[in-house]
UniProtKB/Swiss-Prot annotation:
The gene is YRK. GO terms for molecular function: ATP binding; Fc-gamma receptor I complex binding; non-membrane spanning protein tyrosine kinase activity; phosphotyrosine residue binding; protein kinase binding; signaling receptor binding. The active site is at D389 (proton acceptor). SUPFAM superfamilies: Protein kinase-like (PK-like) (SSF56112), SH2 domain (SSF55550), SH3-domain (SSF50044). This is Proto-oncogene tyrosine-protein kinase Yrk. Keywords: ATP-binding, Kinase, Lipoprotein, Myristate, Nucleotide-binding, Palmitate, Phosphoprotein, Proto-oncogene, SH2 domain, SH3 domain, Transferase, Tyrosine-protein kinase. A lipid is attached at C3, C6 (S-palmitoyl cysteine).
Length: 536
């Protein structure tokens, strides 16, 4: 339920639009035009025809200069029109002598924006010159500078952020439309007795003359005017707009402008502060870089992999950028190898499910975590890359149940005999597709098999797959056609997806693109009668 303060704030006249709600499970991404309440929303998405929709073609890696598109939002395209005055959206503490500390609201002249994620700027308040992260600033008086503007995030991520604990009814954000170029979407947190907390989406269309509207009866010159209008009155929306959705501090792709291109760093620049875990091939630590920046450091036992091969693979890993992948920041390539990544507060998904707050999660949260992992793997799929070791132990969890994929690509480099034998004690047989375990044929489709096993880890809160069976028995039984039965508390429709992932023929397994779509819309399209108390 929404907080009392916000309920009072939007009561009275602001409730005028509450009678215009949509049916419990609209298939459209958007609520209807608030002045056109036909109620004709009955279609359920056809997941069998998912690939008939237009999708972006795969983008292969194209050499050292390749940086794929992602949700690390920079504004390099904004400055093309001669805009040089920018405003800080967040506080930033300098990490090296080359960059500037600044406060939210501070203004800058941009001197040089050719360095990609780091721009050279001069502060108008202090006169100091240095580098600033480009995704921490926006042009003064632009829509990008507004608290409520979230840019290029998808519908599902908008819902995740709006439904975070502590947000009230009427919390809102505006984002780029996923379906209509040049249009925007307004996403609002709502509440009613039938559905509880949920999010409604309204498309903001653009007039040929340049104005904006949700309904043609109310047109505005700017998005800012539209927002102010709906702050003052619901006017057919589910409720008045109350407060902008809180924004998390953006993720940086590099430790600093210095490590952008030269990201082999000296071991002495790292301080290992707290051991977070032990693995078969090393340890994971929480630490700091340069005494300023919190990081996670994976230390590998000497002999685990060739430093030369690791450095070559790390060149590719560094270029993979997506908000559902743990960002690789830097490496120490001499043994013992150190891998420096972003820090994730809740640790591995496996530990989180078994011993952390994950023990108390219900099915909707577990399915959403699966959808996040599928989104990250769909990106890896588009990039023509392979993970090779996808399981809950290699997924990391942050605040607000954010999940990110870690250790992608590293399994290929391990030189330990107990691992490379594939049936050895250290090899994750229970997660590995039979063609990969028996013949070494690792593909994105063997990752899909592993994802099906990971789904069982989620719904069983970290139980080891194939309970009661050892590795040899699993390999033999799977080859004979055995597949795990539906775990307790798991809906049959979710088990059906697992079984699809475990098809004998790799090409018959679904794509991660499909799995992401299926899981993101799972409770709308597959389990419309689900009640929150159904899964403990």
């Amino acid at each position: 339920m929404g907080c009392v303060h916000c309920k009072e704030k939007i009561s009275g006249k602001g409730q005028g639009g509450s009678g215009t709600g949509t049916p419990a499970h609209p298939p459209s991404q958007y609520d209807p035009d608030p002045t056109q309440l036909s109620g004709a929303f009955t279609h359920i998405p056809d997941f069998n025809n998912f690939h008939a929709a237009a999708v972006s073609p795969p983008v292969p890696f194209s050499g050292p200069g390749f940086y794929p598109c992602n949700t690390l939002q920079a504004h390099s395209s904004i400055t093309g029109g001669g805009v040089t005055l920018f405003i800080a959206l967040y506080d930033y503490e300098a990490r090296t002598e080359d960059d500037l500390s600044f406060q939210k609201g501070e203004k800058f002249h941009i001197i040089n924006n050719t360095e990609g994620d780091w721009w050279e700027a001069r502060s108008l308040s202090s006169g100091a010159t240095g580098y600033i992260p480009s995704n921490y600033v926006a042009p003064v008086d632009s829509i990008q500078a507004e608290e409520w503007y979230f840019g290029k995030i998808g519908r599902k991520d908008a819902e995740r952020q709006l439904l975070c604990h502590g947000n009230c009814r009427g919390t809102f954000l505006i984002r780029e439309s996923e379906t209509t170029k040049g249009a925007y979407s307004l996403s609002i947190r709502d509440w009613d007795e039938a559905k509880g907390d949920h999010v409604k989406h309204y498309k903001i269309r653009k007039l040929d003359s340049g104005g904006y509207y949700i309904t043609t009866r109310a047109q505005f010159d700017t998005i800012q005017q539209l927002v102010q209008h709906y702050i003052e009155r619901a006017a057919g929306l589910c409720c008045r707009l109350a407060v902008p959705c809180p924004k998390g501090t953006p993720k940086l792709a590099d430790l600093s402008v210095k490590t952008k291109d030269v990201w082999e760093i000296p071991r002495e620049s790292l301080q290992l502060l707290q051991k977070l875990g032990n693995g078969q091939f090393g340890e994971v630590w929480m630490g700091t870089w340069n005494g300023t920046t919190k990081v996670a450091v994976k230390t590998l036992k000497p002999g685990t992999m060739s430093p030369e091969a690791f450095l070559e693979e790390a060149q590719i890993m560094k270029r993979l950028r997506h908000d559902k992948l743990v960002q690789l920041y830097a490496v120490v390539s001499e043994e013992p190898i150190y891998i420096v990544t972003e820090f994730m507060s809740q640790g591995s998904l496996l530990d989180f499910l078994k011993d952390g707050d994950g023990r108390y999660l219900k099915l909707p949260q577990l399915v959403d975590m699966a959808a996040q992992i599928a989104a990250g793997m769909a990106y890896i799929e588009r990039m023509n890359y392979i993970h090779r070791d996808l399981r809950a132990a290699n997924i990391l969890v942050g605040d607000n149940l954010v999940c990110k994929i870690a250790d992608f690509g590293l399994a290929r480099l391990i030189e330990d005999n107990e691992y490379t034998a594939r049936q050895g004690a250290k090899f994750p047989i229970k997660w590995t597709a039979p063609e990969a375990a028996l013949f070494g044929k690792f593909t994105i489709k063997s990752d899909v098999w592993s994802f099906g096993i990971l789904l069982t880890e989620l719904v069983t809160k970290g139980r080891v797959p194939y309970p009661g069976m050892n590795n040899r028995e699993v390999l033999e039984q799977v080859e004979r056609g055995y597949r795990m039965q539906c775990p307790g508390g798991c809906p049959p429709s979710l088990h059906d997806v697992m079984v699809q992932c475990w098809k004998r023929e790799p090409e018959e397994r679904p794509t991660f693109e499909y799995l992401q779509s299926f899981l993101e819309d799972y409770f709308t399209a597959t389990e419309p009668q689900y009640q929150p108390g159904d899964n403990q």
